[in-house]
């Protein structure tokens, strides 16, 4: 502390003196005062929001002299100081109602400020509004109009309704305006209304009560929707088609199935990608069209077709060739020359002397099956066939006699690989990986469409045996195959086949029932199933329209699909409207096509669903708007009537209005939202020629879709909806109308209105948002809902659960009055009314004594929700009689053949059948039966001209009683005869 000269520095001396003074005053050691610290952060901060204010309070911090209140409008800050308090509370009045604020508080003293307290948020709200005043109600026809005086500060109102004076009330709407029209009322019922005002602060008390009774006679169409009636899943596979333009069209239109089919597919060569057009076009070989139509073909490779269709979000339906020939090279790629191998058409003018005046205008050497005189039929020779076709064999165990052969087994293996793995949901209620196969195409008319390779009409036996053989083999080549058959052509051939008197040679049984019966029994004998879906083509038969005006054709196009379902429609077709078309079916001149065919399938081969793999009715042209309305009607019918699969011939083209009609069901909003999946009842009192309605709900019960078709070209349709079991809130409409035929127009969302008006010539989907009034714990079905039974016959229904686990108790089953239903006179008995997850119920049906269509309704409850299901009993002619006429009550040594054949006699009676050629199925409990050709525990024997069918029985190797049962055809009433034999 000295400088270099030895003197003490003045500054250092001063510091020393100050330090000594501080030491004496307690600057160190244990005596005297302390150095201060800021207080701890407050704790326990709470906030209470009020109207225009937020009240804060917290726990005091030790040593704090005041508190700073900080506020922000975002969680976690930043914060701005809004006030100071010396107390442990603060009232923030500088706030806006409805805004959320975030607060923290800090403690302060002379030594500084603490950190933040815990954060708390609060949202100041206004006080609830006052109750509305001056509520008035004006009753109208099917509606009640309400109005009231506004409540200050209200953001919306609750309209509440009851049917008793003083309540209770249920909220039916939440409008923001001071008026509301209630269109969900029933004329003649008195309703009581109150209104409350609502804001963020809460709900007011009730307004004054008013009452109103709507009256009047509604002159429009009444549509009654019941979401707890006739509930069933709509198969997604009903929205199919053949030959869409391309994969973009598949995806955009929402096609769920794309069919590879048609006459040409019956001769498809899977290696060369070719087909023969046969009688459709001069018997020439061409490149096959998988997608698109001539001349813009693509995907002629069948395996690539499958891959492309699946990539587009759809499911392929292939056609498995059952004819014995497939095409060679396409004719357009071959130069005409003198060598016969250069001619890829069957009937050549130059080579065969075919008629020269009936030739392909683009290839004048290709003719038809007429000799040079243009009158005599030319039958194709083996040389003609061999230059145009290759033989098609089942597999390589069969010998190719000469040249090139193709093999079904190889093709099926390639198709199976293209289909890929995955499960197939049966009964086809969801889109999965199904390997769908049509077993050829319209096999009943091969003798016409493919007369070159099949010169004779197809017979009953050929059609059954060929199908059963090839369908059974296909399952070994592709174990996931779903086989559709017989892919029958049309109404006349359903019942008569194509082979002259072949029907009378088979017991007089109509072709399709005979074929189905034969396949079922063959499957029973082989312990297999060869038929997965019963498939027919279903062009609604109409009259000769050659003299019709365009307006008449349009009227027919929008009404013709009544053919599918209407029990009252006497067909305008000269084919259907004939008593001689079928001798066995009831109501012969009424098509009733879907219920009738489903009833036949359920009677003969239980569990077999129905498909239409060709349908359309474009009487006024594919591009006409009437075709779009007809198609929209058809899609609704196919879903309501429980079809399993359908493919339109051909798929709608994007340039035509019916393309948009399909999208109303599959992609109405461009985002692939479509018609809901659970069909429900939607009856109406309109003229079915001019109006149709269909309904379905979503699986969660929050969406109801309604399809409304106004098929009247001149007049709007005013419609009053009654929704049972569903509480509607709002809806959006999607409309296709003749004035904008290629555009689906969407409305804005709006409150539900029970009365709406639909433009002339329009198709509209209403997508209604709401909720089920009650959600079923279990859904159930009649199993089956349609079946055929002979006059005075008996059949059993076995209702079962389709979803849920709650037991269902059936309370009633009655034949009822239904438009078009016959006066049945039969009975329905609830033999076992309880349905459980593990056990079906039982309803015994005793048919009446009059053939016809009998409608019935069954009611059941799961303990909370009551549902109804309706169905049809198709009552046929009286059954034929089947009686034992020999070989009963015999005894013989074990292992020996009884000396007398077991014989039965079929007496047709009033059944409509004949005695000759009927199939009788014999089944033995032990031993072996033989019909002289085949043997086993089950064999089929045919009746002779006297109606007698017989088999021999070889007794089993051990002593016992042997029971043998004989069954007559189902179409003749399925009479039973029994034998009792003894092995000793």
Regions found by a protein language model. Give the residues of each.
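C-terminal motif of bacterial Sec signal peptides marking the signal peptidase cleavage site
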Residues: 21-24
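Pro/Thr/Ser/Gly-rich low-complexity, intrinsically disordered linker/stalk tracts
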Residues: 32-63, 97, 110-153, 187, ...
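Beta-strand-rich modules
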Residues: 92-111, 182-201
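N-terminal catalytic cores of secreted or lumenal carbohydrate-active enzymes
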Residues: 218-550
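Glycoside hydrolase catalytic-domain groove-lining segments
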Residues: 463, 469-477, 541-618
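Glycan-recognition and catalytic regions of carbohydrate-active enzymes
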Residues: 624, 635-705, 740
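Carbohydrate-binding surface patches
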Residues: 687-727, 764-769
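The feature marks long extracellular or luminal low-complexity segments
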Residues: 838-840, 846-984
